[in-house]
Amino acid sequence: MRKVFETVVGLNPNFSFRGKQQTRIETFSDAVFALAITLLVLSSTIPETFEDLWASMRDVIPFAICVALIIVIWYQHYIFFLKYGLQDKVTILLNTILLFVLLVYVYPLKFLARFLSEIYGGIFGIIETDLSRFGEYSHQNLKLLMVNYGLGAFAIFLVFSLMYWRAYKMKSLLDLNSYEIFDTKSSIIANLLMCSVPLLSLIITLIDPWGNFRTTILSGFLYFLYVPIMIVFGRITSKKSRRLLQD
Amino acid sequence: MRKVFETVVGLNPNFSFRGKQQTRIETFSDAVFALAITLLVLSSTIPETFEDLWASMRDVIPFAICVALIIVIWYQHYIFFLKYGLQDKVTILLNTILLFVLLVYVYPLKFLARFLSEIYGGIFGIIETDLSRFGEYSHQNLKLLMVNYGLGAFAIFLVFSLMYWRAYKMKSLLDLNSYEIFDTKSSIIANLLMCSVPLLSLIITLIDPWGNFRTTILSGFLYFLYVPIMIVFGRITSKKSRRLLQD
Amino acid sequence: MRKVFETVVGLNPNFSFRGKQQTRIETFSDAVFALAITLLVLSSTIPETFEDLWASMRDVIPFAICVALIIVIWYQHYIFFLKYGLQDKVTILLNTILLFVLLVYVYPLKFLARFLSEIYGGIFGIIETDLSRFGEYSHQNLKLLMVNYGLGAFAIFLVFSLMYWRAYKMKSLLDLNSYEIFDTKSSIIANLLMCSVPLLSLIITLIDPWGNFRTTILSGFLYFLYVPIMIVFGRITSKKSRRLLQD
Amino acid sequence: MRKVFETVVGLNPNFSFRGKQQTRIETFSDAVFALAITLLVLSSTIPETFEDLWASMRDVIPFAICVALIIVIWYQHYIFFLKYGLQDKVTILLNTILLFVLLVYVYPLKFLARFLSEIYGGIFGIIETDLSRFGEYSHQNLKLLMVNYGLGAFAIFLVFSLMYWRAYKMKSLLDLNSYEIFDTKSSIIANLLMCSVPLLSLIITLIDPWGNFRTTILSGFLYFLYVPIMIVFGRITSKKSRRLLQD
């Protein structure tokens, strides 16, 4: 049954899960995650007329982007607690900060997703872009936007790296074997790497080399660095972990 | 105790459940389903006067229709995870899409239920129909309405069929016996059949043979096809499964 | 450990619980109950000024009445599923109706509690009664109020009696002993008795013997019948159950 | 495994937990706590323009204060039920009162945190203080504010002390050893001490020795007494518990 459980969860069966029994921290966190995605979608006005109904359908793409991002964070949270089952005060404190940052960024994320959908909708000719509804669309505001989301993304992944660092600190008590220790260290580094991209974007935005939209466009596109970083890092770690498992 | 559990759940005792232990995906999904039915009912304005109170009671029938539909989807979700207990990334992705479609359609469903209740309330002489509060009641808007809900229903049942297809793909790992494999394949086909009705309705609406209300009335009544389809399909599968169990 | 569990739950240790393992129906229902009491309190406007803050505190008593009523219903729900652990389609259908009636009555309950608090607050000289904010305060509206809440209370306890009736029907499958069968039958009758009071109040209101406020005052005070009914019924059943346990 | 569980929970491994299996009271309470912190953050208006977005970011500090306070209460709730696993009627009643007080104070807490942030933001020169948006900022209103929050804090910790008193009353049934009895008695006293500070603040506010802002400033700063009280009390109890464990 052990092999089936690990595999049906799609996780690496070489890691023995300490957190199969759901704890209250996870039940509480699941309720907050569920509230976040639900209120993101259902905090809009209720369509009373046909016109309202079609207007509300315009938000489907932005909502899809936001829900996907939140679920990615939920999945990281789910894997962490499945692996270690930690419930100590430090983990609860870090978990609270994670949930707080998530909640603070639900509505700003909705704003950003609508804003980007309006821009890309126009670029791909799907809709007629009307950015005026977002208020004063200035370079200063775009810079603040990038700083705002850079801080949010940075905080989320920093907290995850601290949570994995916490698990690493309790490695003897959790009785982690050498493979599991390596896996934990890789998670710390992976999340620190995920932190570094928004940090870089933040720095570029604050330096603001061109003093105009080019800065914010660059700091926006920097987020595509996630793809190569994760591919390269994934290759390095999987090579090492295969060697560890053979030993 | 095994026989009692299967039977108290009202499920076919020949299927051994892999998902008796609740997982976080189910806890998270239950919170979203609970939010969906609650916000559907409680997102209306709070009655401050007697007049508000009676006006709010007018929504009871539309709400009952919506809550019943959402619970039918919840029950399908409940049975799927009880049967297979899957928690891998693909299942989580499909589950996220299912919850997202559900949330996007909560308010539109409320609109549709109110709109249909207004029409049928008038036909049965219960209330004086006043469709003006729904905005411009044109053939074009009704067509968009049918397309909108056709897509929603199509998406929900397509995701369920993909989830059962996922379970079918993991049949050796889940150690499904021949009866359970047959049951899983039947579920894939059942959900594909459930997909086909809204698809048919969508196509009729887009072709719009009459160019007036007759098209939307026909595409609406097509949904009654569910009854004969499910009865016939149910008979076929139960005959085959009895034969399988005897063998 | 068995004795401790029953006793820490404060339940009659002679009844062996079939539902100790939480099911998804209970997790889903708990989320709806939690949403009901939370939205009842938090659906008010957010205090932005000191004046708003004091105005919001005026609602504490009405909210306390509503939350107490909802928790009484939650406790009944909790005991039922703890006793029988049923998860079949009929139980899920009855549970859905129960949750639906609960949700439909959250805001009307808030209205009624505010209305009664305004009246009794004035009678006891705590506040200056101002019923004008509730709209047209006529005999006709009060009658509708009594009919409205009579139907709600009647529906809640009727569903509970049907749920216990369902458990009674599955007594052999649930392997209930004679004491447990007696306990289940008592629960059916108790809930039917709880149904009878709102039914009586409804009938009196519809007959409306005096054609003025005296009718609604009488149909309101009929609810105090709950106390003697439950005391007398409690005595009868505990006598019989003691005899059953001795045999 | 026992030692690991206690330690990963960060609790004193000398206390054997009776409540490892999550009960419905905890699932229900977790949903209410999750709703409290989510609605606290997400009950604000949704930012539609850049200006709204920056205005909404101004609330981050006040929200952080409120979420931290609510999580401290959640942690106390979590530890209580983990230790004793009680589910009897008295515990459910006390738990309901706790959740009710929590819900009633979510919005007032949001008001207080915004108010204090405005004042301290001005003192530390971070923002330009504008207290006019809070309505009439008089000595009378500040007194009512201190009374209001004094009652809330008093009620929360009084309920916790009653819950621990309930566990103490069931010590033989829960089979508590001498160390666990001492730990339970300490929790009663600790919560009564936590009650005493808001009580003292309340009394000072009602006596109102200076008849001006000095009274409310004093009654506000009294809350800093929590720190020395908890340090001294912590030292006394840990000395006694070490001696008990040695015996």
Curated annotation (Swiss-Prot), chains A, B, C, D:
Site feature: Hydrophobic filter residue 3: 42
Residues carrying the site annotation Hydrophobic filter residue 2: 39
Membrane topology value: Multi-pass membrane protein
A single GO BP: potassium ion transmembrane transport
GO CC, any one term: plasma membrane
Positions marked as site (Hydrophobic filter residue 1): 35
Segments passing through the bilayer: 23-44, 56-78, 89-117, 142-165, 187-210, 215-237
Catalysed reaction equations from the record: K(+)(in) = K(+)(out)
InterPro entries listed in its UniProt record: TMEM175-like (IPR010617)
Molecular function GO terms recorded: potassium ion leak channel activity; proton channel activity
Result when mutating residue 38 to A: Decreased selectivity for potassium ion
Subcellular location: Cell membrane
Chain span(s) of sequence motif RxxxFSD motif: 24-30
Origin: domain of life: Bacteria
The protein's assembly and partners: Homotetramer.
Domain remark in the UniProt entry: The six transmembrane regions are tightly packed within each subunit without undergoing domain swapping. Transmembranes TM1-TM3 are positioned on the inner circle of the channel tetramer and participate in inter-subunit interactions that are central to the assembly of the ion conduction pore. The RxxxFSD motif within transmembrane TM1 coordinates a network of specific inter- and intra-subunit interactions with other conserved residues on TM2 and TM3 and plays a key role in the tetrameric assembly of the channel.
Function: Potassium channel; forms a potassium-permeable leak-like channel with weak selectivity for potassium. The channel is permeable for K(+), Rb(+) and Cs(+).
Protein name as it appears in the record: Potassium channel Ftrac_2467
Organism per entry: Marivirga tractuosa (strain ATCC 23168 / DSM 4126 / NBRC 15989 / NCIMB 1408 / VKM B-1430 / H-43) (Microscilla tractuosa)
Lineage, broadest ranks: Bacteria, Pseudomonadati, Bacteroidota, Cytophagia, Cytophagales
